Amino acid sequence: MIATTRRAALLSAFATIGAAALARPAFARQTGKAGAAVDQFAQEVMAAFPDEPGLGITVVEDGEITLAKGYGVRRLGGPDRVTDSTLFGVASNTKAFTAAALAMLVEEGKLAWDDPVTKYLPAFEMSDPIVTRLMTVRDLLCHRSGLTLGAGDLMIWPNPTHTRADIVAGLKYLPIGGQFRGGYAYDNVLYVAAGEVIAALTGAPWEVFIQKRILDPLKMTDSVPLPSLIGNRPRAEPHARMGPPVRGLGPQTVLPFDGSFDSAGAAGGLNASPRDIGKWMQVQLGLGTTPGGVKLWTEASGREMWKPQTITAWSDGPTADNPVRASLQAYALGWFVNDHRGEKIVWHTGGLAGFISYTGLLPGRKSGIMVMTNAEETPVFRSLRYGGPDRLQGRSDFDWIASSKKVQAESEAKLVKDAAEAMTPKGGGAPPTLPLAAYAGTYRDPWYGAVTVSVAGKGKKTSLKIAFDKTPALKGALETFDGDTFKTRFDDRSQEDAFVVFSVKDGAVTGATMRAVSPLADFSYDYQDLKLVKI
């Protein structure tokens, strides 16, 4: 946990650096060279990892878009190529749009960054009344609330029926697992609350503001703020390796497209094309002003959004496998900030089922790169997210492809070992302590809602089924595993399975806890945060 004093020290250090750090160094103008280098590198990456279905890549150099291109196919085995107009889900890269929207409202005098959230959302409540009172609009964006990693994400993922109001109402039941403003833990639910602040101030939903005040002025005509608005636009299909034995291993598989992420739009709803996202990068690098002179926000707001707020990580610096590893990393307002080979880089990643994306901006060069993929291929993503900025700097001296292959091989070996360990019953696969019918019933968690366990079949064919009442995708068989621990087998095999550990007292089931089966499960499957009580 990072103490408040250390955070204050970090902000003080950045304040001392001040404008000098944001002033542009004198780099030689070489517009076009980085775009060509990234294009060549992307082709090398695609050749090195032939299972990667497709990519969309955009490069801005000295304020000009020099590359906006698609690579590969929209669907593995299909004929449709990825082009500069193909839409990808950019997930948490959306957070910078939400921060920019709030910055615009700050400039209009409709709110202040350090106003309490309750001023605009009177019903806003965290589980700690002190945190409720102190939580500001700025805090909503900084991942320093004290919530644990991904807390409450089952209210937004995968495709549940919770409304935005449900999500905000559920916050008061999420335990504060850390120190308020004293540490970093990434969340999504507070960005949903930030979107509701925008709606409360403007009288229109978050997506309407984003469309009218950002996408339309930038002429981002391909892009949509919510997946449900894609319609018949060309889009990439999501892919992942679904095992065996666990997700992340096995052959590449096409996943069903999730178009129902609307409730969490402010946290990750945007779908964008390579040619559109370059316009967003330009206005960011222009500190609120486009190359054509259209001003969306002031330079002061642009700098405010890039100002470090929360320490997120620190290390001993570069390693043999990662020569760009930063010694210190921070979160700003919708962006991460650290250095890349001695230059400030402002960046973010995004992940949805079957999609990974990355935005990296080098303000000193007024240059940046956006990488959008339609698969969960970590070595492809790692090669491009680090090798891309290298090429913006005119470098190609490190073999990111070889390094990423090595890191991936080591990761897969560990994953196989960890998965085998997770799937080995500690009690030797003992039978349940009670008849299966005793586990049936409705279980309720205060922030998520109800989970139903039911009996199917009769006699020797009796089995259990499980259904998350507000998440249609999370339903299927509940198989015996080890005593009172069962394992889900969801009908939708693109979902992460979970262990369900029932609590038994005096011969009766009283409740249950859960945890993901795969060691590589996305943190948004926050089963471990559920405290299910049988009702």
Tell where the protein language model's regions lie, with residue ranges.
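Short, surface-exposed loop or secondary-structure junction motifs
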Residues: 75-76, 129-353
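N-terminal secretory signal peptides and thylakoid transit peptides that target proteins
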Residues: 1-17
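Peripheral terminal and inter-domain segments
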Residues: 312, 321, 343, 383-535
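Short, well-ordered beta-strand elements
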Residues: 347, 358-361, 365-374, 512-513
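Short, conserved catalytic-motif segment at the N-terminal edge
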Residues: 31-90, 110-114, 119-120, 125-127, ...
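Boundary at the C-terminal end of the N-terminal hydrophobic targeting segment
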Residues: 23-28
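Short loop/turn microsegments at loop-to-beta-strand junctions
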Residues: 53-55, 333, 356-358, 499
